[in-house]
Every structure is written in C-alpha cells, then in structure tokens.
C-alpha cells in the first residue's frame, strides 16, 4: 500500500490573512508531499509496506519514522486549523483546560510560550494523558505524542517552513495568528474520543 498526500480540509487560500496560500503551496504542496514521497520510497520492500501510518510511526526508526511521523503530524496539524475559527473552546474541553491551567487565557499563554521556546524545528502539542489530565508537550523534529501514552488534541508546527514566507523569523507573530485559526471542534472531538 502506498500513501497519498491527504486532501486539505479547506482551500489553500482559506486561511488568509493568517496563513497565505503561498505558504500552503510550499508547506502542504511541497514539504508534506515530500514526506509522503520519501515514506513510500523507504517502505517499499520492507516489513512496513502495507501497515497503517500509525503502526509505522509507533514502530519505525530513522528515516522511515521521520517521514511517517511528519506525514501524520502535518495531516493532524491541517485539521487543527480552520477558516473562520479561533475563539475559545466550550463544554468538557473548556472545563478540562480550566482544571489543568486555571483559565483559557493561562493555557494560551503557556502554549504560546512553549511553542516560542521550542528550540529549532518541532511541534508543540496539547495532549490528554491516560488519567484524563491535559498537558502541553513540545517535541523536536518529527517526534510525536503518538509514540507515548498521551493522546494528541492540538498541535502547532514550529518548523520554520510553517511560517517563514509569511512571518520570516518572527515565530511569535505566527503564533499570534495561529490562535485565530484553531479548530476547536476538531480539538473537542479528539478530547472526547
């Protein structure tokens, strides 16, 4: 089984003015596609051929892991975003955020701070621990919570290719705009699952 680039859940220009169509053209159309292509090339003729993406991420190492995890991470990230989104979550997710961080504002501050301080390339995540509590986790490079007991709920890509076209080296500015796009419906579904 070979993997294909999953369709975006919106048009490339739908996230403007926060994330440009040009960024999506490169980030999704080039970077994400390259991870898919590399993964297919690397798994051909191996024990990973025919396995699900999640199975590969949880059991592979080296180049196969890096490319599989980046395919999964990016696909998850695209679903964490939506046009005309943002705002704040409600219901059980809002209650869990308040229990873990004191308030939504405090969560947003801590998540943003973790993403800004995530050195180099990587991802910052909101995860649900096996005991139901929430935590903010930063991972480097292709690392992902899929390899841990925690369940990913939300992520932001802090590799420079995620924001360099629109914001150059100003990661904090990118993160400020990220909050206007967070798809809380997707995050809430992950939390409830």
Where are these regions (language model features)?
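Feature for soluble, non-membrane regions of globular proteins
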Residues: 1-193
């Amino acid at each position: 089984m070979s993997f294909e680039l999953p369709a975006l859940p919106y048009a490339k220009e739908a996230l403007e003015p926060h994330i440009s169509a040009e960024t999506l053209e490169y980030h999704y159309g080039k970077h994400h596609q390259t991870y898919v292509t590399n993964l297919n090339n690397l798994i051909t003729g191996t024990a990973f051929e025919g396995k699900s993406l999640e199975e590969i991420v949880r059991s592979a190492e080296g180049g196969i892991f890096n490319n599989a995890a980046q395919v999964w991470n990016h696909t998850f990230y695209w679903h964490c975003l939506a046009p005309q989104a943002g705002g704040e979550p409600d219901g059980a997710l809002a209650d869990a955020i308040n229990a873990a961080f004191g308030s939504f504002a405090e969560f947003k501050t801590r998540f943003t701070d973790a993403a800004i301080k995530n050195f180099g390339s990587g991802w910052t995540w909101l995860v649900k621990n096996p005991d139901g509590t929430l935590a903010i986790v930063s991972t480097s490079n292709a690392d992902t919570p899929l390899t841990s007991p925690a369940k990913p709920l939300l992520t932001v890509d802090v590799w420079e290719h995620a924001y360099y076209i629109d914001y150059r080296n100003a990661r904090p500015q990118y993160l400020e705009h990220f909050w206007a796009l967070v798809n809380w419906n997707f995050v809430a579904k992950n939390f409830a699952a």
